[in-house]
Each structure stands twice: as structure tokens, then as C-alpha cells.
From Swiss-Prot:
Alphabetically ordered keywords of this record: NAD, Transferase
Stretches assigned to coiled coil: none
HAMAP family xrefs: KptA
Record Pfam families: PTS_2-RNA
GO molecular function terms listed in the Swiss-Prot or TrEMBL record: NAD+ poly-ADP-ribosyltransferase activity; tRNA 2'-phosphotransferase activity
Protein name: Probable RNA 2'-phosphotransferase
Domain of life: Bacteria
Entry's family note: Belongs to the KptA/TPT1 family.
EC number: 2.7.1.-
Organism: Rhodopirellula baltica (strain DSM 10527 / NCIMB 13988 / SH1)
């Protein structure tokens, strides 16, 4: 197994390229977010980022959040969700959410969320978790986490469309404040 540091660095690089800025290596995602692996490797290496097929496969196999997926033929790779690149359609199908979903955040964002709800901002969707632990972990990346509860089933009944990504992240366009329960 590659050193953890190399896997983390490669995962971050793949997130940058496959979710946000494929242009940093002179590439463009197709309409479903795929990149040809051979082109990814060649373009990354010519720009000073050491990348191999073996390393890509190891990152895909070991990433605990299952951020990346390979095409059935193994020739392409894409991010499972989290894109900020406009025009990426992951061909997600509508899903019926559980009664409650969760979102982790920090105190600094609570006033805006109370007023505006959860907004996708630069991403294509708002990301929600099916369990408290995952949402708390997400929130802890920016400080002391605060857990928000989302009345997902009520939202769905009111016409909001939910999707479930390949790596089990719940996605929705926005969460209005009326569907949120805030920490006390």
C-alpha cells in the first residue's frame, strides 16, 4: 500500500480535477463528469503531478468516502458527487429520503442558515448525511461541529426532489429554514 500521505495528496488532487477545476491540467469533464484515465495521467504528469494507473486504482479502492468511481470498462473516472463544474449531470434518479437527514456545520454559518436555509452555493447540490456521525465529521472539518436536522420526508412530500449519490450522500437543491431543526 502506498504511504497514506501520497494517497491523501492524490485524493485531494483528484477531487480538485474531477469536481472543481479540470482545466488545471488542461482537460474538460464530459457531460456526466467523466475523464479518460490515460489523458488524466498524461496531463497530470506533464504538469508535474506524479500519477499512475496503480495509484488511481488504490485511491478509488481505499477512499473511505468512496469519492470516486471507475467506469465499467475501467477507462474513465469521475467523482461520485460534489461537483462545482457547471453542466455535469450524474444521471441521478429521484430517491425517497428517510424521515430525517443531517447536515454538519459550525457556529459561524448558523445565522445565515437560519435566515436562508442551506444553499448549494458553488456546488450543484446541498449535501446531506443519513447518519449523525457522518454529518458531525463533515462539520468538524471547519471547527466545533453543530448538527442540523432536516425534515427530509416532509420536504419530499412538499415537492422537493432528493437524489442519492453512488457513495450514499443525499443531494437536494436547497433546504429552506422551515425544514431545519437547529442545535440549542
Amino acid at each position: 500500500m502506498k504511504a497514506d500521505k501520497q494517497l491523501v495528496s492524490t485524493s485531494k488532487f483528484l477531487s480538485l480535477v474531477l469536481r472543481h477545476q479540470p482545466g488545471v491540467i488542461g482537460m474538460t469533464l464530459d457531460e456526466q463528469g467523466w475523464l479518460e484515465i490515460d489523458g488524466l495521467i498524461a496531463n497530470a504528469n506533464t504538469r508535474g503531478k506524479k500519477l499512475t494507473l496503480e495509484l488511481i486504482h488504490e485511491v478509488v479502492a481505499t477512499n473511505d468516502k468512496k469519492r470516486f468511481v471507475l467506469s465499467d470498462d475501467g477507462l474513465r473516472i469521475r467523482a461520485s458527487q460534489g461537483h462545482s463544474v457547471a453542466g455535469v449531470d450524474l444521471n441521478l434518479t429521484e430517491a425517497n429520503p428517510p424521515a430525517t437527514l443531517y447536515h454538519g456545520t459550525v457556529d459561524a454559518f448558523l445565522p445565515r442558515i437560519r435566515e436562508q436555509g442551506l444553499q448549494k452555493r458553488s456546488r450543484n447540490h446541498v449535501h446531506l448525511s443519513a447518519d449523525e456521525a457522518t454529518a458531525t465529521n463533515v462539520g468538524s472539518r471547519r471547527g466545533k461541529p453543530k448538527l442540523l436536522l432536516i425534515a427530509a420526508q416532509r420536504m419530499h412530500q412538499d415537492g422537493h426532489i432528493f437524489y442519492l449519490s453512488e457513495n450514499e450522500v443525499w443531494l437536494v437543491d436547497s433546504v429552506p429554514p422551515t425544514y431545519l431543526t437547529f442545535p440549542t
